[in-house]
C-alpha cells in the first residue's frame, strides 16, 4: 500500500496482511451481498482503504495526551456498510475502541466475522437506524469521535451523527467533490445540533484526481432531546 506512505503511515507486515485478508473477504462476500461496486484490488486500496485512512493526519493533530489518547478514544462509525472507515482505522490504530453501526443486520453479522478473522479486538457491532440508536442512553453523547462515509446531505448526516458525540468530541464526515455550498447550507443545522465548524481539510485522494474533504465539527453543547427526529425525517426534511 504505497498510498499509506503518502499519508504518512508506516504499516507493519501484520497490518499489511490484515488489509489483504480484508480485501479478500470483501470481494468474496460481495459475490452474494451488495457491499461495494469497487472490487479491483488497486481501486479498493485507493478508494476504500486509503480514503478511510485520510483521517490519519487529523487524528494525529487531535492527539493531545500522547499515545494514551488512542487507548481512551471511543469512536463510532455511522452507516459503516462494508466497514469503511472503521475497520481500516482500527487496523492502523489498534488501541481505538470502535463501534460499527449499520442498518442492515446481515452486514453487521459479516463485519463481526471479518473482525474476528482479522484478530481485531475492542470492536462493538450495532444493528439499527442511527435515528433510533442515537436516542439510546448507552450511545447518546457517549463517543469522543463519530465518523461517517455515508452518502447523505451534510445537514441530514449531522442530525444522524451529532447525537452520538459527547461535548468536547468531534464529528468528522468524509465528503467528496465540491462541498462549499453544501457546507454553507448545513451551518445552521450544525449549530442547532450543538456543533461548531472547526476546520475543513480539502485534498486529492492519492493516485487519483478525486476531490475529498474532511469536515471537522466540534461538539460544544448537548443536543436537544427532540433530535434526532423520527426515522426518515432528517433525510426528507433536512434542518435549515
Question: Which residues fall in each region the model found?
Answer:
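Class I SAM-dependent transferase core
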Residues: 1-70, 76, 106-123
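Short loop/edge segments at beta-strand edges and connector loops
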Residues: 13, 39, 127-129, 199-201
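Conserved SAM/SAH cofactor-binding pocket of Class I
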Residues: 53-152, 158
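Helix-to-beta-strand junctions that scaffold the AdoMet/dcAdoMet cofactor pocket
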Residues: 93, 165-167
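Short alpha-helix immediately C-terminal to the canonical SAM-binding loop
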Residues: 107-109, 179, 183
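Short "lid" loop at the C-terminus of a central beta-strand within the Rossmann-like core
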Residues: 131, 176-180, 205
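Conserved beta-strand signature within the Rossmann-like core of class I S-adenosyl-L-methionine
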Residues: 168-178
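SAM/dcSAM-binding transferase cores
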Residues: 184-240
Amino acid at each position: 500500500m504505497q498510498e499509506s506512505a503518502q499519508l504518512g503511515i508506516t504499516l507493519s507486515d501484520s497490518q499489511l496482511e490484515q488489509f489483504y485478508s480484508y480485501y479478500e473477504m470483501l470481494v468474496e462476500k460481495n459475490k452474494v451481498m451488495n457491499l461495494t461496486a469497487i472490487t479491483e484490488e488497486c481501486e479498493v486500496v485507493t478508494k476504500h482503504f486509503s480514503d478511510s485512512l485520510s483521517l490519519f493526519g487529523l487524528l494525529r493533530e487531535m492527539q493531545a495526551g500522547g499515545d494514551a489518547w488512542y487507548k481512551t478514544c471511543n469512536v463510532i462509525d455511522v452507516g459503516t456498510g462494508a466497514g469503511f472507515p472503521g475497520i481500516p482505522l482500527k487496523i492502523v490504530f489498534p488501541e481505538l475502541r470502535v463501534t460499527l453501526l449499520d442498518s442492515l443486520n446481515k452486514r453487521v453479522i459479516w463485519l463481526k466475522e471479518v473482525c474476528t478473522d482479522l484478530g481485531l479486538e475492542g470492536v462493538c457491532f450495532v444493528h439499527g437506524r442511527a435515528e433510533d440508536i442515537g436516542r439510546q442512553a448507552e450511545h447518546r453523547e457517549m463517543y469522543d469521535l463519530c465518523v461517517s462515509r455515508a452518502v447523505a446531505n451534510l445537514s441530514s448526516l449531522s442530525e444522524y451523527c451529532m447525537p452520538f458525540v459527547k461535548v468536547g468530541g468531534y464529528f468528522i464526515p468524509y465528503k467528496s467533490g465540491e462541498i462549499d455550498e453544501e457546507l454553507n447550507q448545513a451551518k445552521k443545522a450544525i449549530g442547532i445540533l450543538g456543533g461548531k465548524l472547526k476546520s475543513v481539510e480539502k485534498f486529492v485522494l492519492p493516485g487519483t484526481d478525486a476531490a475529498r474533504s474532511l469536515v471537522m465539527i466540534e461538539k460544544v453543547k448537548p443536543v436537544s432531546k427532540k433530535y434526532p427526529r423520527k426515522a426518515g425525517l432528517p433525510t426528507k426534511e433536512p434542518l435549515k
